Amino acid sequence: MGERNFHLHGNSFNRRAIGTEYETLACEYLTRHGYQILCRNFRCRQGEIDIIARDRDYLVFIEVKYRRDEHEGDPAEAVDARKQARILRTARYYMTRYHISEDTPCRCDVVAVLGSNVRLIRDAFWCG
């Protein structure tokens, strides 16, 4: 993935660049595991979803979280109840906007990147 030490973590531009870098890494990982990427960085008033994909019959809403090392904590823990609620509202909006049936099987996954390790957590939280 290359050197990352040029990033200054306090700068919002650099945080966005880091986020984009790890979302790209997540997309590559997901694609290798059979996911079809439909959309990246879907934004609306309700919030943002990092990646929207298909995994077999499922429409999957995916949050990507990164931490440099274990001293910063488990990246998956950053997807707290408030963040989950925002993702769910955004997912509902996405489905309404694109006329996706409520009967479509959906789930919410998290891609947790800790250093150079990528971990996929399928069905990380209830998707409704």
Regions found by a protein language model. Give the residues of each.
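Solvent-exposed beta-strand sheet faces enriched in polar/charged residues
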Residues: 41, 65, 109-111
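Acidic-basic catalytic patches of nuclease active cores, encompassing PD-(D/E)XK
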Residues: 1-40
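Arginine/glycine-rich "motif VI" loop of SF2 helicases in the C-terminal RecA-like domain
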Residues: 82-102
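Conserved catalytic cores of phosphodiester-cleaving nucleases, focusing on short active-site segments
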Residues: 49-75, 81, 87
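Domain-level recognition of nuclease-like catalytic cores that cleave nucleotide substrates
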Residues: 97-128
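Active-site metal-binding core of divalent-cation-utilizing nuclease and nuclease-like domains
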Residues: 32, 36-61, 128
